Structures are given as structure tokens and as C-alpha cells.
Regions:
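Short hydrophobic beta-strand element within catalytic cores of glycosyltransferases
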Residues: 317-320, 327-331, 347
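Acidic donor-binding loop of glycosyltransferase active sites
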Residues: 181, 284, 290, 299-313, ...
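Donor nucleotide-sugar binding/catalytic pocket of nucleotide-sugar-dependent glycosyltransferases
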Residues: 62, 135, 143, 162-166, ...
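N-terminal subdomain of nucleotide-sugar transferases
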Residues: 1-63, 108
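A short, well-ordered alpha-helix in the C-terminal region of glycosyltransferases
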Residues: 368-382, 389-392
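Conserved catalytic-core segment of nucleotide-activated headgroup transferases in glycan assembly
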Residues: 207-300
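Conserved acidic donor-binding segment of nucleotide-sugar-dependent glycosyltransferases
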Residues: 346-353, 361-366
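Acceptor-binding helix/loop patch of EC 2.4 sugar-transfer enzymes
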Residues: 8, 69-93, 135-171, 235
Length: 411
């Protein structure tokens, strides 16, 4: 197949869950298919990132773009502009006449068999109708993320803004789903939420492509020398991650420290916001920023924590930690959409006291911790290696090209 793949940015560096998911899928697809990848590229993006993209695509087309840094005057001015715009901010900021023109040029001259829109933003730059089969690859239910932002907003002004964005996203997401021949979701939970929110919008049933993990890369590592050490990984400029860490340090960590005074915490991930950096300064927490390899950091943890209150899709970080045989404690939202069993593969805990107790129990009970670690590793190795997930994705593209519905794989 000749595939036109649309995204809002380059996949490199591989520092976000959505980038990782797409990278692994494209890496397998590129072995047999011809992929043209079209996206924005940040001005100043390294030449190495562009060259590295050739591992997953045959051709790379980019449109230059600069995203204002979060917290700057330019960032707030850009956000304010979109308060009165009709599109939701998360989509509207990517609307571009230059991008749309490049898409039209590719569609008119490329002889493509199928077009894949990766996430929602590229949809804003697509023609209303397409002459070739089209697939929307969703990694989240975006409207649900904004609903949770609104519910967890700290003041009435923020709540009003988040509610406005939620309502705009509901309208845009419904319209986007209706425009594609096939919609792919990353979990049964997301599929069910789409069907509940947007009845009648879909051309055919949603196909679920499960989350995978590179089990040969994320393997158990020796050398742990820190007791009572907790680890969290993620892009720290993504609001759900920032909110989760602020919530954990405010409401959960003090309870853990009452029982385990020597407990330590590392927050590993790119672009920590000022609020996250203050956690390191005021609470004795290690905030690393971007690291080249998360594995040595994860390996040092007794417990891997995912205290998210906002989110959608699935958390690749959980499968990565499980693949490294780490005991995970997560909220229900954090583990949403993953085919895991609490008490067997990981521990689910939603209330602060419950979450703290689960962490303390795993720190103290090495036998229970090892049992969960072993079960976690076994689950992902047996069922969720990327090769099998990518084959399902490929089969779905081939089916929509033929005009057929993909065959659902059993979990």
C-alpha cells in the first residue's frame, strides 16, 4: 500500500506516548509499505530528527511552525486568540493554509491508496471529502479530556474556559469522526465512549488497535539500589501529567511519608513546568527533565506510580513499566482502557488514602511486590508485543482500502 500519514509534528524525539505508539506501528508498516509522512516541524528542529524519520517513512514533507513556549506572553496571547475562535484550541492552533495546500498537492499527485490522520489536528487541514479511503487514528477521546479538565479546574474562571473548550471539542470531534471511512481507537473503553457521545456519527463500527510495548527493549534491569523509591515518567508539559503530580505530592505523598519517612520520588520527563520544578525545590523530589533513556530511572523504583485524574486513550508508560517487571499503582483513569486486573497485574487505587496504602504495602511486602512484577511482565510479553499490534493495524488499513470492515482480534 501507498500510505499518506498526516500528523501535527515529527515523531522524534520519542518523548511522548502518542509519538511512541505511532513510531512502533509505522516502523512495522514501513517494512512492507510505502509511507509519506506529512507534518509540521518546529523551527530549529534538529537535522538528526528529520534524518531519523526515514526509519519509518519513505518520504517526509514538513511545514515550518513555532509553538510558543508554555507560560510565556506569546503563549497566553495565542491561547486568548483561540478563546473567540470557532475551533477548539487544541485543534485550531494547528490550522494552516500552507499545511492544507501541501495535503491537497499530495492527494492530487501521490497515487495514495489510503490516508491516515493521526490525532485530530490534521483534520482541520483536510478537504471535506476525500477521493481515497481515509482512516482517523485516535489516541484519546479528546472531549473526555476537556470534560475532566473542567471538572478538576481549580477556580470558576478556569472551569468556564475548560467547559467552553469541552463543548467545542464535542462538536469538532463528532464532525471529524463522521468524515472518515474508518476510526481506530486504542481501547475498548474509548470505542464505547465514542459510540456513547456520538451516536450515528460513524460510517462503520470503530476498530480497536490495542496498545503495545517493545518487550525486548523494556526488560527487567539489575542494579536497583534505592529502597522505598517511587518513579513517575511522562511529558511534564502535558496538563494531565502535571495535574497528577501536583495532586500526588499534595494529597498522597504526605500520607506515604507518615508510614515511610525515607520514601523518595523521581519525576522523569521532558519540559517540566514551573509548578513541577517547584516540587523539586520545595518537597525534595527529583525532577530530571528530559532524559535519553528512561529505563535506568524506572529500574531504580520499588513502585511505579500513575496518579492521573485526567486523561483518555491508554498509558503506554504503564505497559513499559510492566514490561520492566515493575509493580504499578494507578488510578482508574491512569489505567483506563488497559486490559489489566487490579491485584494481579497492578494495583488500582483512586482515593488518596487508598493510593498511599497500596504504595506502602508494596514497599514493605517484597513477596507481594514480586508477584505483581512477575505477572505484569508475563502479561505484556504474551499478548502485547508491538509486532502483533502492528499487524492488526495493517490489516485494518487493508480492509478499509477494500471497502470492508476490519476483523476484530480477540484480546
Amino acid at each position: 500500500m501507498k500510505i499518506l500519514w498526516l500528523n501535527s509534528g515529527l515523531l522524534l524525539p520519542l518523548d511522548k506516548g502518542g509519538k511512541l505508539r505511532t513510531w512502533h506501528l509505522m516502523r512495522h508498516l514501513a517494512l512492507k509499505h510505502d509511507i509519506t509522512y506529512l507534518s509540521f516541524a518546529e523551527r530549529g528542529q534538529s537535522h538528526a530528527d528529520r534524518v531519523g524519520m526515514r526509519e519509518v517513512c519513505n518520504a517526509l514533507e514538513t511545514v515550518p511552525r513555532t509553538d510558543p513556549a508554555k507560560g510565556t506572553l506569546a503563549f497566553y496571547a495565542d491561547a486568548a486568540k483561540h478563546v473567540v475562535a470557532p475551533l477548539p484550541y487544541a485543534v485550531g492552533k494547528y490550522r494552516s493554509a500552507e499545511y492544507a495546500a501541501l495535503v491537497r498537492k499530495c492527494l492530487e499527485s501521490g497515487g495514495f491508496d489510503v490516508v491516515v490522520a493521526d490525532f485530530l489536528p490534521p483534520v482541520a487541514n483536510l478537504p471535506r471529502t476525500l477521493a481515497i479511503p481515509s482512516v482517523l487514528f485516535t489516541h484519546n477521546v479528546e472531549a473526555e479530556i476537556w470534560r475532566r479538565h473542567a471538572e478538576n479546574a481549580s477556580n470558576p474562571f478556569s472551569r468556564a474556559l475548560m467547559t467552553q473548550q469541552w463543548n467545542r471539542m464535542l462538536r469538532f470531534e463528532r464532525d471529524a469522526l463522521s468524515r472518515f471511512d474508518l476510526v481506530l481507537a486504542v481501547s475498548d473503553a474509548d470505542s464505547q465512549t465514542f459510540e456513547r457521545l456520538y451516536p450515528g456519527a460513524l460510517r462503520r463500527p470503530i476498530h480497536v488497535v490495542q496498545t503495545g510495548v517493545d518487550t525486548s527493549y523494556f526488560t527487567p534491569m539489575p542494579g536497583k539500589d534505592r529502597r522505598a523509591h517511587l518513579v513517575f515518567t511522562g511529558s511534564m508539559d502535558w496538563l494531565p501529567n502535571e495535574d497528577g503530580m501536583l495532586y500526588f505530592v499534595r494529597d498522597i505523598l504526605p500520607r506515604i511519608r507518615q508510614a515511610e519517612p525515607d520514601v523518595t520520588l523521581s519525576i522523569i520527563g521532558r519540559a517540566p513546568t514551573p509548578a513541577v520544578k517547584r516540587l523539586g525545590e520545595e518537597h525534595g523530589i527529583e525532577v530530571t527533565g528530559r532524559v535519553d533513556d528512561v529505563r535506568p530511572h524506572v529500574a531504580q523504583g520499588d513502585v511505579y506510580i500513575v496518579p492521573l485524574r485526567i486523561g483518555g486513550g491508554t498509558r503506554l508508560k504503564i505497559f513499559e513499566a510492566m514490561s520492566m517487571a515493575k509493580a504499578v499503582v494507578s488510578t482508574t483513569v491512569g489505567a483506563e482502557g488497559l486490559p489489566v486486573t487490579s491485584g494481579q497485574d497492578l494495583v488500582i487505587a483512586d482515593e488518596p488514602a487508598q493510593f498511599a496504602d497500596a504504595v506502602v504495602n508494596l514497599i514493605r511486602d517484597s513477596s507481594a511486590r514480586r508477584q505483581i512484577e512477575s505477572a505484569a511482565r508475563q502479561l505484556v510479553v504474551e499478548k502485547y508485543d508491538w509486532a502483533a499490534v502492528a499487524q492488526d493495524f495493517e490489516d485494518a488499513l487493508a480492509a478499509v482500502r477494500r471497502g470492508a470492515a476490519p476483523v476484530r482480534l480477540s484480546a
